[in-house]
Amino acid sequence: MKKEDVVAGMLAYIAHLREVGRYSTAKSYLDALRSFKCFCGMEEIPYAYIDKERLLLYQAWLSKRGCMRNTVSTYMRRIRHIYNLAVEAGEVSYIPNLFKGVFTGVESKRKKALPLDSLRSLMGTPRVEPEMRRTQLCFCLMFSFSGMAFVDFAHLRKENVKDGVLSYHRQKSGSFIRVEIPVSYTHLRA
């Protein structure tokens, strides 16, 4: 089946991603598609419609709408990937340097660290209301477990703790993580 336009090509790829269980990546492609359709003002976008000038206009449009550079880059890389798939399938002719000048890099984020006094206050204040105490304890554990994401914390089971080591798979990436449990938390073993 030929997918002569960007929308059809991206929807087919999104369906493939969902079939193989890559739901977060599929959502990223869907977000990029919705944004590009909004910019173009069309439901069907032929590959011929994509040119360097239009990509630069789209980049500027995203920036004006308040998108961060990494979001702009992600959307552009999604479009570039679908375009490259179409080139490989012979649906569109290759245009050299089509994405040259378009930001597709990754900008490192400035870490927003909590001041030490605030961290001590959050972790050491036992004077919180009883209904907030559990939240405070969860925060302390997540911080102590190398800044564990809440979604990973929520999926933990007793089986994840063995011999003073917490082992789990990240929900976001599926990567395997092993964290040595600080001595002060060894009473958590089941």
Where do the protein language model's features map onto the residues?
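N-terminal helical hairpins
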Residues: 1-4, 19
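Basic, Lys/Arg-rich DNA-contacting stretches centered on the C-terminal catalytic core
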Residues: 104, 163-185
